[in-house]
């Protein structure tokens, strides 16, 4: 397997950001790429996306009419042409390398070229509140399974199987971990700091979730309570259900946090309860945008303030009023037509021909 050279981006900085600068919480920059073979349909497709925290900021697609790294966030659009030329060059080089890697892995696993295969690659760095490296990443997967990964010490590799051990030996001989460590501790950290500074209005904001609980009957004896958190940023959030103060994690259905398409996220957690015991359950929400954890429960819809019999009586009265108005209108029209020498039946035929005039007249009454 060909050794992937680390992405060495030139620091296009007039002055390096201070190491002592701080940010609220930890932050990350990750690049994700996928290479998919297409037997009989041309070269494999290569797609690469970059994220700062939960926000995509760059994207490359080898199938584009003019393949190049493109901005996906407003703050990165201000980078100069040198940045985009270098990013595009690196992505094209990675695409070519992974095409070779696909062929190599077919040999390692004794597979036919007739099938579809994928290589996934993820690398990046996490930054602490003090602006220093927390963790570096560099890992591969083949056909959806772990292949090889750089360990937390950034000096050694973990191979998932015998085929990956071949790559591990090659990379150990070439001292590939040293180059990757230099990138993660240097270039990756510096660019993440730069993105956090340039995109701070978007990346360092905290939008609290909008929360509510919905009630869904399952049977005559059970119902599902679903706790919703909508429109929050960043994506990290905790939803838990409690019954009389005790966590219900084992009985709770929890979906993955999902993007809403407008730069925020949504999530829900559900629990099945016995009908009549809904009041015993509370949903607890923790998020960076909330000053303190928030607790809510399902509130049954309020009862109507007017009794049912009262509503029936009111409707009966309204019906009588409308009926009286219609009768009065008919009698008035009959008298009017008699004065003109016409008949009531002629007037009725004339009204029906005008379509909605009767309804319009009735509404006015």
From Swiss-Prot:
Membrane topology listed for this record: Single-pass type I membrane protein
Protein task: Involved in the presentation of foreign antigens to the immune system.
Bridged cysteine pairs (disulfide): 125-188, 227-283
UniProt name for this protein: Saoe class I histocompatibility antigen, C alpha chain
Comp. bias regions, Polar residues: 346-359
Stretches for region Connecting peptide: 299-308
Gene3D superfamilies associated with the record: Immunoglobulins (2.60.40.10), MHC class I-like antigen recognition-like (3.30.500.10)
InterPro entries named among the record's database cross-references: Ig-like_dom (IPR007110), Ig-like_dom_sf (IPR036179), Ig-like_fold (IPR013783), Ig/MHC_CS (IPR003006), Ig_C1-set (IPR003597), MHC_class-I_related (IPR050208), MHC_I-like_Ag-recog (IPR011161), MHC_I-like_Ag-recog_sf (IPR037055)
Taxonomy, superkingdom: Eukaryota
Organism: Saguinus oedipus
Region feature Alpha-1, mapped onto this chain: 25-114
GO biological process, one term: antigen processing and presentation of endogenous peptide antigen via MHC class Ib
Residue ranges of the region described as Alpha-2: 115-206
Residues with attached carbohydrate: 110
UniProt record similarity statement: Belongs to the MHC class I family.
Keywords tagged on the record: Disulfide bond, Glycoprotein, Immunity, Membrane, MHC I, Phosphoprotein, Signal, Transmembrane, Transmembrane helix
Subcellular location as annotated: Membrane
Occurrences of domain Ig-like C1-type (ranges): 209-297
